[in-house]
Structures are given as C-alpha cells and as structure tokens.
Amino acid sequence: MHYLTVQDVLWIHLQIAKKPGKFSFANLEEATSYQYAYGKSHDVMSQAARFFGGFATKAPFDSANRTVAFVAGVVFLELNGRHFNPKEKDLGAWLDRAVNQPTSNEAIEESTIASTDSHPVECRDVAKAVLEKYEAAIKKLLE
C-alpha cells in the first residue's frame, strides 16, 4: 500500500488554493490518517472511502477541504492500483456520494478500474496528473 504524507496533502492544498492556508495540524494529521486501516492494509476501496469521508469531515484547512479530499482521495486510489474513471460528469455530486459513508464504497467502486500500470510512481507526479486532468472539476468544486 502507498500512502500520502501530511506534507503531500499540504502540497496538494497549496496547488489548489494557490497560497498557503491556515490549518489545524492536529486535524490535518487525523484527516490524513483516515487512509490507514487497522491490522493488515489490503482493502483499497474501504480505505479510500474512509479517506474521502474522514478528510472532508475533519476539514483541517480554512478553505478547499472538499477539493483537497477529492484530489488526495483520487491520488490514493491511483497510487494503489485503482484508476479513477468516473462515469458521472458532475464530480461534485460524485464527491457527495463518496464522502457519505452509506454510499462511499459504491461510488468509488463504480468509478475505478484496476490499473494496468505496474511501475512505481511518485505521489507528487500522480497528484500533478490528477490536478491537470480534473482542472475544470476542481475549479467548480472551489465555487
């Protein structure tokens, strides 16, 4: 399993907000830790669901928390062999489903496919690709 660090999430927030923002370090650490599972970590979908929902709920930043949750969650999926391929055009509506515990696993499973890439990837490279690919959706999430 590959995980984002607190520093990775701070970097993602900086790319989205375009300026350093205020944040609660304790909440940021807790929000970032939602990607982990107890015991053996092998269930990417459940861990991603916890990460999307937990990060959005913890809201460690003074702005753009849902958007950071979206980007960081997609990066987590991509790092762990799940290619994000949403069928929904409205990623805001998709994110609402992904952060809502009863529907989160379903939303994530419907929107990902197993990746055929087997080479190691760097978190920031994946994040840059996600930020570029979903630039329009990210702008819309920030509105």
Give each language-model segment a name.
Residues M1-E143:
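FIC/Doc superfamily catalytic core
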